[in-house]
Amino acid sequence: MIKLIVGLGNPGAEYAATRHNAGFWLVDQLARMGHVTLRNETRFHGYAARATLWSHEVWLLQPQTFMNRSGLATVALARFYKILPDEILVVHDELDLLPGAVKLKLGGGSGGHNGLKDIAAHLTTQQFWRLRVGIGHPRNLLPPGTAPSGQHDVANFVLKAPRREEQELIDRAIDRSLDALPDLVAGNAERAMMRLHTTG
């Protein structure tokens, strides 16, 4: 059963449309579905709201600490409400999946994602759920015949907005995720993964 859904991203209007904020996009959708407003909660270092989703109470959180300090916000809320690591779902952008792909898993490494790394360090465990929203890697998304250059490095790539066709694929992946989340929130992870990984 999931009691806390954390969307990863960077605060501020200048980052709102960037690939690194894919986690924020999904949590924004959940807030709309739950008819709640994410409010600045200084004790949790982020925007948070408690929503009733699919007949379950779930906390929604968007850390406002910048990506590399996401663990600070996640642990503050989880400890306050006595939420266990395996009751937490972290939604994040994933370079190793193409736009349109999305994967759900429990545990595993951080894959070089600094937000995940910081959350694992603060929770002192890797055993939390991750929803990996594919954004692609600059080496896979270059036009044919284009050689990678400095401007295509990963740090620059994740802080840019996706191209229109990529954004459409990411939006579709988020919609598919929302279809699978009721099962995960209710504690049926196997069915959620089957639904997510065998569609689209």
Curated annotation (Swiss-Prot):
It is found in: Cytoplasm. The active site is at 20 (proton acceptor). It comes from Ralstonia nicotianae (strain ATCC BAA-1114 / GMI1000) (Ralstonia solanacearum). TRNA binds at residues 15, 66, 68, 114. Its EC number is 3.1.1.29. Hydrolyzes ribosome-free peptidyl-tRNAs (with 1 or more amino acids incorporated), which drop off the ribosome during protein synthesis, or as a result of ribosome stalling. Pfam families: Pept_tRNA_hydro (PF01195). Keywords: Cytoplasm, Hydrolase, RNA-binding, tRNA-binding. This is Peptidyl-tRNA hydrolase. One of its GO terms (cellular component) is cytoplasm. PROSITE patterns: PEPT_TRNA_HYDROL_1, PEPT_TRNA_HYDROL_2. CDD domains: PTH (cd00462). Belongs to the PTH family. InterPro entries: Pept_tRNA_hydro, Pept_tRNA_hydro_CS, Pept_tRNA_hydro_sf. Its main location: cytoplasm. The record marks 93 as: Stabilizes the basic form of H active site to accept a proton. One of its GO terms (biological process) is rescue of stalled ribosome. Monomer. NCBIfam families: pth. One of its GO terms (molecular function) is tRNA binding. The gene is pth. It catalyses: an N-acyl-L-alpha-aminoacyl-tRNA + H2O = an N-acyl-L-amino acid + a tRNA + H(+). The record marks 10 as: Discriminates between blocked and unblocked aminoacyl-tRNA.
